């Protein structure tokens, strides 16, 4: 069985390999997703300036009040909707999706699908 730290290292290797191909620009910033055991995080990043334009996560007080559990697919969908709403409010319509070395499956896929349904294009 693969130990937790080894799984983390393998994910970081995958993420590094992925980041060689994906780069966020001001016209089309990068939607970066991070999945921990208890929370989901999403940021829209302009890599040319190195700044976060929009962020959303299950750690926010409003999200915690809205959700019973912060680690399931329902929570990931809510984060996806929220990040899309905030991005559209700032005038960001297109992004490049960065899965962060995670499989495009489960919570990561749910977040991406919810963001697409809310109006983000990628």
UniProtKB/Swiss-Prot annotation:
It holds the Pfam family Ribosomal_L18p. GO terms for molecular function: 5S rRNA binding; structural constituent of ribosome. Transmembrane segments: none annotated. GO terms for cellular component: cytosolic large ribosomal subunit. CDD domains: Ribosomal_L18_L5e. One of its GO terms (biological process) is translation. The keyword RNA-binding applies. Gene3D superfamilies: 3.30.420.100. The keyword Ribonucleoprotein applies. Keywords: Ribonucleoprotein, Ribosomal protein, RNA-binding, rRNA-binding. Part of the 50S ribosomal subunit; part of the 5S rRNA/L5/L18/L25 subcomplex. Contacts the 5S and 23S rRNAs. Belongs to the universal ribosomal protein uL18 family. This is one of the proteins that bind and probably mediate the attachment of the 5S RNA into the large ribosomal subunit, where it forms part of the central protuberance. This is Large ribosomal subunit protein uL18. It comes from Fervidobacterium nodosum (strain ATCC 35602 / DSM 5306 / Rt17-B1). The lineage of its organism: Bacteria, Thermotogati, Thermotogota, Thermotogae, Thermotogales.
């Amino acid at each position: 069985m693969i130990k937790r730290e080894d799984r983390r290292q393998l994910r970081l290797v995958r993420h590094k390999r992925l980041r060689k191909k994906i780069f966020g620009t001001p016209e089309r910033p990068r939607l970066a997703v991070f999945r921990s055991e208890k929370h989901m995080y999403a940021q829209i990043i302009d890599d040319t300036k190195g700044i976060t334009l929009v962020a959303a996560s299950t750690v926010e007080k409003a999200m915690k009040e809205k959700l019973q559990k912060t680690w399931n697919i329902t929570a990931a969908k809510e984060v996806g909707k929220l990040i899309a709403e905030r991005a559209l409010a700032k005038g960001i319509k297109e992004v490049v999706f960065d899965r962060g070395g995670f499989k495009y499956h489960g919570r990561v896929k749910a977040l991406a699908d919810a963001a697409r349904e809310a109006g983000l294009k990628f």
